[in-house]
């Protein structure tokens, strides 16, 4: 079913988040802008943040090691973020939700990731565990937007609305008040608005299709293995080959992934509409008090999503071809963490000033998490030379 034919079948307007209540509150009060909404301004602040720009130098899946040839067409955290933002805009538009809030959350959803992708995050978390701590990229993103982005004369951080800060934390998971008492202002007993719930699924749709593309492009995945292991890909690939028998393999793959993405997005829109209708929910408050999240794929499409994700983990993310990337990320991140813990003088002055309040291990993790792949390589090399 085409999205265009359903644009009038919006969700009840009272379900969409708005900035006129608690969600629009900022830590430091600001006068309203003459032309832009508060959520729109938040999106712009995220877009102009240094941490956002650094996403261009952070790995999505492929980390280019020092002796690797250039690979300019693989996705970075920044290109992935832009793809998630495009999907999220479509979802919000089709469902009649708050597009400005949705876009701000999509732009911010990966801003807390460290270098070297998930391998880097795992290594940083492992380093912190030895000090009774851990690393969570959502919570680190909150630290970035509330403190480390120091761009304004009147306040520290970006002074984002509560709605955006809550969505940054809760778009992909729920947190308990007992485990995270410091997050008390973020309504931990409530579901996030639908705008935030959709970001996690937009993220999955973007990276599933993109990682199949990058895996095939890299040669780690073969077309036949993907066809065998990902049923939804095989179905669409068969239809493309029948329709365009003369198409080159790369063109057929591109068309297949485009159709696969469209099917996932369309299914998500239709399923959210159906779940909201069946639940009888009419307001944002009812969304937030619902017993479970309402943003989900249909059972059949969820099975296809799970199969694709399982295939990627077994054949791509954990493949021998990616093992050297993971090993290098672990060596660099854990090695630099140890080096800075041994010599805190390697920290910039503004980070050292936070050690009494936060503890050395957390500040070292903050510093490393903000690095690009190339910068951490440089610093790691310098630290080894002593």
Predicted regions and their residues:
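Short strand->helix junction
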Residues: 74, 113-114
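A glycine- and small-aliphatic-rich helix-loop capping segment at beta-alpha/alpha-beta transitions
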Residues: 117-128
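Histidine-centered, transition-metal-coordinating active-site segments
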Residues: 1-91, 99-100, 120, 134, ...
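Basic, low-complexity intrinsically disordered segments
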Residues: 95, 106, 177
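Short active-site segment of divalent metal-dependent hydrolases/proteases
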Residues: 108, 112-113, 206
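Alpha-helix boundary/capping segments in eukaryotic regulatory proteins
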Residues: 94-99, 112
């Amino acid at each position: 079913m085409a999205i265009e034919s359903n644009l009038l079948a919006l969700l009840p307007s009272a379900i969409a988040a708005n900035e006129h209540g608690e969600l629009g509150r900022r830590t430091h009060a600001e006068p309203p802008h003459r032309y832009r909404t508060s959520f729109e301004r938040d999106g712009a602040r995220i877009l102009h943040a240094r941490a956002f720009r650094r996403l261009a130098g952070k790995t999505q899946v492929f980390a280019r090691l020092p002796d690797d040839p250039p690979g300019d067409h693989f996705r970075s955290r920044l290109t992935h973020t832009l793809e998630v933002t495009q999907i999220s805009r479509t979802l919000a538009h089709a469902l009649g939700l708050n597009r400005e809030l949705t876009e701000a959350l999509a732009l911010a959803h990966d801003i807390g990731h460290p270098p070297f992708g998930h391998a880097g995050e795992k290594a940083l978390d492992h380093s912190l565990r030895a000090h009774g701590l851990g690393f969570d990229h959502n919570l680190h993103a909150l630290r970035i937007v509330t403190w480390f982005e120091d761009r304004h004369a009147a306040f520290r951080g970006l002074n984002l609305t509560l709605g955006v800060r809550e969505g940054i934390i809760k778009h992909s998971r729920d947190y308990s008040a007992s485990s995270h008492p410091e997050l008390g202002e973020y309504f931990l007993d409530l579901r996030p608005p639908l705008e935030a719930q959709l970001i996690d699924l937009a993220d999955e749709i973007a990276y599933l299709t993109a990682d199949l593309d990058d895996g095939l492009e890299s040669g780690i995945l073969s077309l036949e293995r993907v066809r065998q292991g990902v049923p939804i890909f095989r179905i669409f690939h068969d239809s493309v080959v029948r329709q365009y028998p003369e198409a080159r393999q790369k063109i057929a793959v591109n068309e297949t992934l485009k159709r696969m993405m469209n099917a996932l997005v369309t299914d998500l829109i239709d399923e959210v509409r159906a779940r909201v209708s069946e639940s009888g929910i009419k307001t944002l408050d009812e969304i937030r008090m619902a017993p479970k999240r309402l943003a989900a794929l249909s059972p059949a499409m969820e099975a296809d999503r799970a199969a694709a994700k399982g295939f990627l983990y077994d054949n791509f993310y954990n493949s021998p071809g990616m093992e050297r990337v993971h090993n290098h990320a672990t060596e660099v991140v854990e090695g630099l963490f140890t080096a800075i813990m041994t010599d805190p003088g390697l920290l910039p002055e503004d980070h050292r000033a936070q050690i009494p309040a936060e503890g050395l291990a957390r500040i070292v993790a903050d510093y490393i998490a903000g690095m690009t792949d190339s910068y951490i390589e440089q610093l790691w090399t310098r630290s080894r030379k002593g």
